[in-house]
Structure formats: structure tokens, C-alpha cells
From Swiss-Prot:
It is an enzyme of class 7 (translocase). Signal peptide: none annotated. This is Phospholipid-transporting ATPase IF. Its cofactor is Mg(2+). The chain crosses the membrane at residues 69-89, 91-111, 287-307, 338-358, 862-882, 910-930, 963-983, 994-1014, 1033-1053, 1060-1080. It is a multi-pass membrane protein. Mg(2+) binds at residues 407, 409, 820, 824. Component of a P4-ATPase flippase complex which consists of a catalytic alpha subunit ATP11B and an accessory beta subunit TMEM30A. NCBIfam families: ATPase-Plipid (TIGR01652), ATPase_P-type (TIGR01494). PROSITE patterns: ATPASE_E1_E2. It comes from Mus musculus (Mouse). GO terms for cellular component: early endosome membrane; endoplasmic reticulum; Golgi apparatus; phospholipid-translocating ATPase complex; recycling endosome membrane. The lineage of its organism: Eukaryota, Metazoa, Chordata, Craniata, Vertebrata. It comes from the Eukaryota.
Amino acid sequence: MWRWVRQQLGFDPPHQSDTRTIYIANRFPQNGLYTPQKFIDNRIISSKYTIWNFVPKNLFEQFRRVANFYFLIIFLVQLMIDTPTSPITSGLPLFFVITVTAIKQGYEDWLRHNSDNEVNGAPVYVVRSGGLVKTRSKNIRVGDIVRIAKDEIFPADLVLLSSDRLDGSCHVTTASLDGETNLKTHVSVPETAVLQTVANLDSLIAVIECQQPEADLYRFMGRMIITQQMEEIVRPLGPESLLLRGARLKNTKEIFGVAVYTGMETKMALNYKSKSQKRSAVEKSMNTFLIIYLIILISEAIISTILKYTWQAEEKWDEPWYNQKTEHQRNSSKILRFISDFLAFLVLYNFIIPISLYVTVEMQKFLGSFFIGWDLDLYHEESDQKAQVNTSDLNEELGQVEYVFTDKTGTLTENEMQFRECSINGLKYQEINGKLVPEGPSPDSTEGEVPFLGSLSHLSNSAHLTATSLRTSPESETELIKEHDLFFKAVSLCHTVQISNVQTDGIGDGPWQPNLAPAQLEYYASSPDEKALVEAAARAGIIFVGISEETMEVKVLGRLERYKLLHILEFDSDRRRMSVIVQAPSGEKLLFAKGAESSILPKCIGGEIAKTRIHVDEFALKGLRTLCIAYRQFTAKEYEDVDRRLFEARTALQHREEKLADAFQYIEKDLILLGATAVEDRLQDKVRETIEALRMAGIKVWVLTGDKHETAVSVSLSCGHFHRTMNILELINQKSDSGCAEQLRQLARRITEDHVIQHGLVVDGTSLSLALREHEKLFMEVCRNCSAVLCCRMAPLQKAKVIRLIKISPEKPITLAVGDGANDVSMIQEAHVGIGIMGKEGRQAARNSDYAIARFKFLSKLLFVHGHFYYIRIATLVQYFFYKNVCFITPQFLYQFYCLFSQQTLYDSVYLTLYNICFTSLPVLIYSLVEQHIDPHVLQSKPTLYRDISKNGLLSIKAFLYWTVLGFSHAFIFFFGSYFLVGKDTSLLGNGQMFGNWTFGTLVFTVMVITVTVKMALETHFWTWINHLVTWGSIIFYFIFSLFYGGILWPFLGSQNMYFVFIQLLSSGSAWFAILLMVVTCLFIDVVKKVFDRQLHPTSTEKAQLAEAHSSVKCLDSVCCFPGETPCASVGRMLERVIGRCSPNHISRLWNASDPFYTNDRSILTLSPMDSSTC
């Protein structure tokens, strides 16, 4: 029993095997010794709550937040002891915040419940008792055989058993899982591929042993043990056999598969897990400010308590006769009384901590994140992709970036490969005018044309491809033809490219038809490099036709050749190569390999290695992507050994990856080099301009790529990452720690000696590993003094290590990583902000990123406009919230000096409750959503303005102290201005009476509401109709509410303290004079400071505002005038000169496609930038 309890609490989890055993069709052994493993059902549960646990679970989650818990404690203190304010003052705002959050989360969870019910209730067909049974998806059990028809979604993770194809293969699309739109081929084992009917499957006796569930979509290890005629046949299972839940069946009429993972154990469900939480610099500053204000709160409570007891200790200040202490008070413990009074003062001043700050910030981030997706400037028309926001918690972090780390291929480049050149057996060729010719002839010359290769007209444009007629040639030319033949055969066979049969109705069904003309073939591949190379081979006359029953078919000069595909040695980032083993028509066993020259050339023992290496370097200097091609021929005995090793590695359930790596290492050796290929990956549009803009903004750009040194440097120069005038330093080919350290010291000396010029650093993966191992500080010193850094030959984890090294450096800079492929996920998740490019290498980077965009050039708009605006908005929001709460509570503290620390409240309880909820909340919320202190086009055209907000400047201690001191000074003016103007002089009132406590407090509260609201108006640079509505509407609402609240006797209120108070206040001319005088006095200080700052020490942003205001139409007229009216033109000119701001002119309701930035109907909610013709 105790162990069960510990297991339920998670302290003693039950032992779980590393593998699971699945009996197909749930045919368990009948010997009675087998205990079936327990598996979960196939229900998907994405919801968090049930109808029974919603209230307690949601409350628990909300009160884990420090601010909510703090106000809960204050509320409980008010209930337990005699406090000066009603528990409603803390309880109602807390109830409002908790209720709004609970409703939002409850509604979202209700939507998740509906979605779950729809998915779990979907109809499926399962093979049971020799027939097909219709059931619901949630009823599928592990071991069930499921039938899926064309275009249906797989309801669980299935191991493919058979399909309507003879070879048992099928095509699926995983676009909903990883975003990859290309079709993927999945295969079944030969023994089950022939079982294409329900009756045949009912006779299958087989067991699957596989790993326990894991989230990696591309990793699966298992084996199938089939019993046939009392013999057991073992077949390996890999990712190519697993059909993932959420994927869709394509190009296949139907398949049968056995469920191996169900419900929340499917890979799709395991990927629901959220990424590690990232916290922005603004959030960290906000938490710091909360701690400071908590210290201020406790200090005020302690000071008030001490002063109270100090006063009571003096005999002359004893309690008056009408307020004598009770017997209980005189006999109670002084310590308990001190604690009680301290808690009472704590309750009295607790509103200095803004309860609504968290809710307002959440709403601002949530609503503000939509603007990125609505921005047409971030929409890519060709791919029909708009910007995506995967997390709204980091919007303001986009305005604080100091380092950008970017991948190259697919991020800076288009990832659209075009075959350009190749090297075959030491001879270099290039494509000129559709012909592959040796290097040297002019474009119009045909002399020297390769006799075997012929026309290079594009595959998609030719109805039929024929090679040029072979010329009569001597033996040397015949040998040359054979070498070229073998080279392009290797290119046509060593790949994972697939073919769809182009028909009038789209993708055809059925097996491949090798007699199709090339124009009827369409290649598609997950790697653009492979597609480009296979198409180039086809243009050269060696056409890959397709795969039929594990046979690769190639047309050579119109003659069909069949190669039996024996093994595929898949590509991985560690080996940086892939290989295939095929059996040629002649019966020879051949291995064809292709990969990076650093992984292929060391494995070669023959061929023109030296010449090819030179050609590869020449290709790289042109910025071309290179691959080397090699082959190996096996004897019968060698192949038996290779086949045995691969079988043992692939059927292993433990350490399969390590065993496969060892097997690949053993097999891929003693290669004969055939040549190398060079494909061009052109730069994306406006990459150079974007990188230059980032540099002007003070952001350092690092390029992290897996390409070789020469290719990476060439691309860095072409994209403007490196300048021609820049001094390029290199840390490459380091073999030892000592050599690496010495090279780093030399680089540091060179930078010190040539400190005037800019430096760029190139470092390769091997040298980087040595530098990070023992010489981090020295390496960082060199990097910090370089304007641009290029890291080549990088492994995915090395990219993440580099970013982490920068993150933990003493300066703690904000980092941003941008990439497009699965190998970029680690660095995207490591950086403070991760940007995924929705490119051609799937959607893994976009799915794991914080933001996703279609092109690198959109990064400038994302940072310089959205990031700038978001940071300005939320930084002002945070500072303003603390400012207005200091204004709110400080008069309460000052009032205690005049009421002898009796804990008498200055404000009415209703005003205490509604101050942050109703009277002052909307103006700052709208400001934080639509404020544009400068035109977006100016921000993009002047990247240097980005420097003004760097280093979290608006939330620095200096800025925090300014807002805090401003709040205290305004509070002193509120209190003492009211006290000296109307609080002491009875002649100011017509009836000869002094203001009472509630009238005095209401006067202070009225001045405060008006002042903090107009203060928000002074901070606003971009006025829309909704700004006017909430700003002036908040003040009007306060007056209407106060008249309504104080003008009626409310029967349900315990006291009528405010009855007729506000009406009496407004009836006094001296009160109106005091309100106007105090508001002007408070804001005059702020206006004077702004004027002097702009005249004496203007920032770059303020200079741009002034320049923009002078060059624009006087747009302040729109605040108070209709078009054509000019009563306020002179006021507008004066204010524009002083503070350099404007508001949009009268705007038509007609939307224009040329309108910049957002596409909203601007007459409803103007979220667009200030029109350049107006401001």
C-alpha cells in the first residue's frame, strides 16, 4: 500500500522495461506463463481540466503566481484582524483578476475538450475475428490491426504491414507534424507485404519488439518476429516502417498497420510538450521592481507602526477622553498589538503593489502578438506564408537584441539548388548554354563537348531526352565515357529522391511505370541538393525512373537498367555522408557514396584525389555547395560480411545507433573517388541590406554553417557579412590545445595592433571545439573585438554551445538565433529569441521557434519596427503602473501624520477598489497596443534608432528612479496642495465649513485620477480615435460614476460616507481652482524636463521625431479640428516644435492595398503607422 502511494505521488515510479512487446492482433501465447503488458488507450487528452477538478486546480495554478498569492494573504489578513479598509478593497480586485483568468482558461479548455471529442470519436476500421469492425478511434488498442484508406489520417502510430502495392509500400504526407509537404515513402517487411486481405492478415502470427515511446519524430527502433511454418523470421523495423499519428495517407488506396503506440504515447502527443520557458529582460526588471516596492511597502508599514507607538509613549499625546482604550486593549500583549498594527498598516498601503499589472501585461502581450501576423510587410506571397507567433512572452525582447546568430543554407540563401559544375576523374566541367562542357571553351563553342553527355536542356521542358550520338573514339575516349557513365550512375542511384507520375488528375496511383518519358516524371526530395543532382544526371542522359519492388530503375541512353537496392546507409550529421549498396545488372555488388569532401576524401584510396580537392576548393571560392562522389566494389565474401553486420546492427534493440555507426564506419572505407559536384544556392532577396541594417543598429551578426571554409567565406563576402576592406582573421585546422591557444594569442595581438580597422573572424568546427574546451575567455576576447564572426563546419550542438557561451559572458547580451532546418533547432531553443525560417527543409525550425517568418529580410521589420514598438510600449506600461500606484498610496501614508497613525483611510473603499480596475487601466492598455512614437518607415530607414532602446535602457535603475521620484513628487503635490489650498482655510467654502475627511480625500483622488490620465496622454505620441475615447472617457467616466455613486442612498451599503460628498466638492469654486492648479503644477514639471532634454540632450529618436514633425503637415489639427478648420493650428505648431509628435489626419474608411504596416480598417481601430502624407 505504501509503495502504491509513493508511486502515485511520483516518488517511486514503477519499473518500466526499455522495450515493449506487441502481439499482432493481440494473439497472446496460450501457455499461461505470459503476463500481457498494460498499454494506455487511444484517447488524446489535450485538455487540462475536468468538470470536477477545474475550480481547485485552476485556483492552485493561479495562486502559484507571487502577486496573486500576495493579495490573497492581504485579503485573509483583512478578514482576520481589525483593519482600516474593508476586505472588499483587496478581495474584489483579486476576485476580478482570478475570475477573468479562470474564464479565459476555462473557455480555452472547453475548446480543447471539443477538439479531443471530435478526434477520439472519429470512425476507424479494425481487423477483429476475421473481419473488419467499425469502431471509434479511442477504442483502438495496442496490437490492433487497423485499415486506413486513401487521404485518411492515421489514428495511432502504426507499423506498416501491407498496402495495395505489390511491394507493400505507401506514400504519406507529414505536413501536420513537421510541415514537410513532400511525400514520404514507407515500406513494410517482405513477409507481411503479401498479406493484402483481411483473411490473410487474420492468419498472421507475429510479434513486434520495439523501444518505449519517445518524442523524436524521426527515430524508431524495433524488430518483427514472424512465425512461418514453425520457423521464426526476424526483420528490422525503423522509421521507414512507422506511420505516425496525424500523418495522412497519399497515393495509396489502402494500407493495413498494427498499432504500436496509442493515445498520449504517440509521437504526435509527446510533442505537445511545451518548450522550456524563456523570460524576457522586461519581465526580469519587472520582478526586480516588485521586490523594491515590496521593500518600500514594508518600510512604510514599519515606520508607521514605530511612529504610532512613539506617539503613544508620550503622556501629553494620550488618547482623548472619548477614545479611551478598552480593557482588552490595555491587557493585550504589546508584541501582538505591534504585529496587529503592522499588518493593519501593511493592508492600508498594499495598493502600492499593482495587482492588475500582470493581467494588463498578459493582455498586452497576447493582443499585441496578433499585429505581427497581420503585418502584410511580413507576408510572403510566393509561398503564401505570413509571420507566425509561437510565444507572445518575448515580443519586447525583439527590441533588445545584441547578437544575431544565423544559419546560411535556406536562411541567407534560397535553398533552391541549381547544378553548375562538376569534376569527373580530375577533369572539370561546367554547364554553359544547356551543355556540359570542359572548363575553358567560350559559351558559343561546342568544341570539347563531352561526347557522352550531350544536351543539358531542362528536364521539365523536353518531351524526350536523347544523348548525343557517340563519336568514333579511341580507347582513351571509351575509358572516359565509362568514367562519366559511372559518375552519373552514382548520382542517379545514391539518393532518397522519389518520383510522382504526372497525370492529368494529379499524382497517379499504383506502382511506377518505367516506360514513362522523362517529361512525365516529377522528382521530389527532402533535400534540394539531391533533387538538383538527379535532375542534372537526367539531363545528361542517365535518367532515374523510379523504384519498383526494391529495384532502382535507370535509363541509360534510352536503355533501361535495373539495380537491386540492397541497403541504404542513411545520411546523418555526424558522418556527413550517405551511401547505397546495389546489385548491378551484371551481378556486381557496388557501394555508391556521396558527402562532404571532409568525410569522403579521407576514405578514398583511389581516383584523382589531389585534382578533385583543388577543384572542390575552386568551386567553394565561387560560393558553390560541393559534394564528393565515390564508389566501392564488394567481393561475394565482403558483401556477406557487410550484410551480416548491417543485419545485426539493425535488429538490435539496445544501442542500435552506436552499432549502426560502427557498421557504417567499417563499410564506408577503401573508396574510389569518382569526382565532385557543385550546385549553386543563390542568396535570398535583400540579405545584404538586412545584414548591413543589423550592423548599423549595433547588432553583431554571426554566421554558423556546416559548409566548408571556402564556401562559407565566399557567401559571407557576397552577402555583406564580411566587407572587402575588413581584415579577415582565421582560426582553422587547429589540431592541439597548445596550437589553438597560441593562434588565439596571435589574433588578440593583431586586433590590438590594428584596432582602427574592422576585423572579421573565421573559425571551423574542429578549432572551435579546442577553443571552447580550454580557452573560452581568450576566444571570447577575440570574438568581442571582431565586427563579424563566421563559424564553418559546425555541428548542430556546436551552434548551441556558441550561443550559450555568448549568453553567459559578463555582458549578458540578448541573443537571437535564426535558422530553417532541423539542425538549427538546438540553437533556436538556446537563444533568448528563436526565429524559424519557413523554408524548404521542413518546419521543425519553425515549430520549435518563438517566431517564424518566410524570409530573412523580414528580420529587419521584426526587430526595428515591431521590436522597437513592443519594447517602448511595455517598458512605459510597467513604469507607468508603478508611478500611478506611488501616486495612489503616498497620500495615504502622509495622511497618517495628520490622523495620529490611527490607520484611518484617506479614500473611500469603492475608490480603492476601482482605481486600478476602471479609472486608470484603459488608457495605458490602449497605449501599450497602438503607440507608435515614430513612423515605422523611419525606424526601418534609420536602423541606428534601435540603439536608443538597447541595454534595457527604458527600464534601467535611472529610469526607474525617475518614475518613482516623479510619483512621490506628484503625490506630495496632491496631498499638500489639497491641504493648504482647501484643507485649512474655512473662508474658501461658502458655508464657512472646512472640508471633512471624505471630501478632502475625494479632492486628492480627483486630482490624482486627472493627473495620471493626462500624464499618460503626454506620453502618447500617436493619437487614434480609441486613444481619445479611453483617455478623456476615463476622466468623464470617473466624474459620472462619482456623481452617481455619491448622489444616491444605496440601501445595500453598510455606510453612506460618500453621500453628497462629490456634489458638494464640485459646487466649490475653490475646489475647481485647486484641481486645475495642482494638475498644471504636476505636469508642468514633466513638460519642462521634456523640453530641456529635447533641446539640450536629444536622443537620436527625438531628433528623428523633430525632423519628422517639421517635414510633415501640421497634423495636430486632427485632435480638435475637422479638415479645413485651423483654430488650433498655432497650438499645434508650438507643441510640434517642443515635443515633436503628431496624430493621424482625418482618415477615410476605405482600405487601400498600398497602406503600409497593418491592414485593419483604420476608421475602426487605427493600428497602422502615421500616414507619411500626414505625419
